From Swiss-Prot:
Subcellular localization: Cytoplasm, Cytosol; Cytoplasm, P-body
Organism placement in taxonomy: Eukaryota, Fungi, Dikarya, Ascomycota, Pezizomycotina
Keyword RNA-binding: yes
Record protein name field: RNA-binding protein VTS1
Main location: cytoplasm
GO cellular component, one term: P-body
Role description: RNA-binding protein involved in post-transcriptional regulation through transcript degradation.
Similarity comment: Belongs to the VTS1 family.
InterPro entries: SAM, SAM/pointed_sf, SMAUG/VTS1_RNA-bind, VTS1_SAM
Presence of keyword Glycosyltransferase: no
Pfam families (alphabetical): SAM_2, Vts1
Every SAM domain range: 552-613
Compositionally biased intervals (Basic and acidic residues): 522-531
One BP annotation, GO: protein transport
Gene: VTS1
Length: 620
């Protein structure tokens, strides 16, 4: 009976309530109830709008809660799936926003010039250097950028074989340059550039409207566009519905019916405004905005930019509803001869990074590269970027392995013999050398020859005794003045005997041929000759050597030893008087700590001079 009563209650949920509570099997009462009565029918939702909710016997939650009660334990799972779907849609929106911002930033001519200069620098790196550079740049990415790159890299892995990505045959033609420039461009999203890209971070509700055609963006970033399309396809396959979006954007889709006005005029109101008012429309043709722009080349394959003097123009302060104008101040159309020389290098001589001071090897073949790759603006921008990493104002960026020059001391015994006769200079007919002094000024041929002549005449100019007999005894060394190694800044460094090639020759000179007599036969250490230091004193010193038999000097043993350049033995001999010191012999000096044989011989010679002076009565 209890079960029957329960069934009766369940079956009576959608009927009018019974007046009595006794359990019975008879059907529910079919009393006539007016249409305006609140108890007309429980399933009639019109009764919920009645003005007197206090007359209701069943609460409103009995109606609203039935769908949730019927789901049971599947409710939590459905909520989690909804959250995952919403997050997926948000990620796709973020990818599209990122791609649109990248495309808008790439259209900036100044940024394109800077990126082209970076690509030229990147082209001369080895594989290991490219990997290290990309790894260092990826350390600056945000979490949004990391997720974006993961999708793009996965798409790149599907489209390109591994061998083609790791070792491209030609950097200019390989699609890898597009992907690398994408990475370079994406790192500037969170920078402090004063552009409209900051509006998407500050106010998410005011999305930017680039007005770019989706096919244009796809052509500029093919892998990124393909990755986003793949994500959309996955979402549609999983959920059965295409991803909906509330983005006010027209990138990669045509959901722009409710979007705010973009840069391109609408189709129906095209004739309302003046023709050509938009920077993206080249004329009044009705198909210009809808037609894909074929002039937009992919990233990494930029055409020659307009000569704009290499200067950035101030960016306008734009509100969320204003159109984005191109703000590059282009110079008037002039011939190349009228343009200012922004670079000291010839514009048709090839890669800017190769025009370094390398007398040992010639630079890149100028005929192999086109003039479009070395335009004036790219050279100027590249020089500004490279100025941060120069040494002595010399550009030393081109050090690729296949162009790396041999070291000056790696020559085999039959190659590059030392010249033994007068030579005016090193003849390099194929070398394209540009000399730059420490002030960054380009030197002419006459100035370079004058510097070489000065170096030839002043071979011993840094020595205290230019007429030292040691150099005159070696006629072969006197003709090496015009030759300087690349390590000496290419004919611009003052002559120094510390050059590796000359130091080897100086070490082989017999000291007896120097014509040194008396106490000058001893040098306190070997580095004095290697450094080109005169035995009588420091370089550049005009003070004559002091007389070791000076009575005043003999009273001060430390000063006397210093005049003989034997001050390292002051602690061993300072407690003795000069009269006792000159009586020491070789064995006694060795016992005193004078271990060097040359020092002992020099002391004994000076002792003999002092004894002779004492015998002559000079010392009293």
């Amino acid at each position: 009976m209890h079960n029957m009563s329960g069934n009766h209650v369940i079956g009576n949920r959608n009927s009018t309530p019974e007046a009595n509570n006794t359990s019975t099997l008879r059907p529910p009462s079919s009393r006539a109830i007016g249409s305006g009565h609140s108890l007309r029918a429980s399933a009639d939702m019109a009764s919920l709008t009645g003005p007197s909710p206090s007359n209701r016997i069943r609460p409103s939650s009995d109606f609203y809660g039935q769908a949730q009660q019927n789901l049971g334990p599947n409710n939590a799972e459905s909520d989690s799936q909804d959250k995952i779907a919403q997050q997926w849609i948000a990620d796709i929106d973020q990818y599209e926003t990122t791609l649109e911002e990248m495309a808008a930033a790439t259209l900036d001519q100044d940024f394109k010039d800077e990126l082209s200069a970076i690509e030229q620098w990147f082209r001369v790196l080895s594989e290991a250097e490219r990997t290290a550079a990309l790894y260092a740049l990826l350390q600056q990415t945000t979490q949004v950028q990391i997720r974006f790159f993961i999708q793009v890299l996965q798409q790149m892995g599907k489209n390109h074989p591994l061998s083609g990505v790791l070792s491209p045959a030609s950097f200019d033609k390989d699609p890898m340059s597009n992907r690398l420039s994408d990475a370079m461009n994406k790192l500037n999203v969170d920078s402090a550039r004063n552009s409209m890209a900051r509006s998407s971070v500050i106010a998410p509700s005011t999305k930017r409207h680039s007005g770019l055609d989706p096919t244009t963006i796809s052509a500029m970033f093919p892998d990124a566009a393909a990755a986003i399309a793949t994500e959309k396809a996955k979402f549609t396959q999983q959920t059965g519905n295409p991803p909906s979006s509330n983005r006010n954007s027209i990138a990669l889709d045509h959901r722009s019916s409710m979007a705010a006005p973009s840069i391109s005029a609408p189709q129906d109101g095209r004739d309302a405004g003046p023709a050509g008012s938009s920077p993206w429309n080249s004329g009044g043709n009705g198909d210009t905005s809808a037609k894909p722009s074929s002039s937009q080349t992919p990233m990494g394959q930029f055409v020659q930019p307009t000569p704009s003097g290499g200067l950035r123009s101030p960016r306008p302060q734009l509100s969320s509803n204003n159109t984005i104008q191109q703000t590059t101040l282009n110079a008037p159309d002039k011939t190349p001869a009228d343009l200012p020389l922004l670079s000291p290098y010839n514009a048709g001589s090839g890669n800017w990074a190769s025009m370094v001071n390398t007398p040992m090897t010639s630079t890149f073949n100028a005929a192999a590269t086109g003039g479009n790759q070395a335009d004036m603006v790219a050279n100027a921008t590249a020089m500004k970027l490279a100025a941060l990493s120069t040494v002595n104002n010399r550009f030393a960026l081109d050090d690729v392995r296949k162009y790396r020059r041999a070291r000056s001391n790696d020559g085999t015994p039959g190659q590059n013999p030392v010249p033994t006769g007068p030579q005016p200079g090193i003849n390099m007919p194929n070398a394209n050398v540009v000399m730059i002094n420490e002030h960054g000024q380009v030197l002419s041929r006459e100035q370079i020859m004058a510097l070489q002549a000065q170096q030839s005449l002043g071979m011993g100019g840094q020595r205290s005794r230019p007429s030292s007999p040691g150099l005159a005894m070696q006629p072969g060394l006197a003709h090496m003045a015009p030759f300087t190694s690349p390590q000496n800044n290419g004919f611009l460094s003052a002559y120094d005997v510390s050059s590796p090639l000359l130091s080897a020759g100086m070490q082989s000179v017999n000291m007896g041929s120097l014509g040194m007599g008396g106490h000058e036969g001893y040098l306190s250490d070997h580095s004095d000759m290697v450094r080109g230091r005169s035995p009588r004193g420091r370089r550049g010193s005009s003070k004559p050597p002091e007389d070791p038999t000076d009575p005043t000097l003999l009273q001060d043993i430390p000063s006397w030893l210093r005049s003989l350049r034997l001050h390292k033995y002051t602690d061993n001999l300072k407690d003795m008087k000069w009269t006792d010191l000159i009586e020491l012999d070789d064995k006694a000096l060795e016992e005193r700590g004078v271990n060097a044989l040359g020092a002992r011989r020099k002391m004994l010679k000076v002792f003999e001079q002092v004894k002779e002076a004492k015998a002559d009565g000079k010392l009293g």
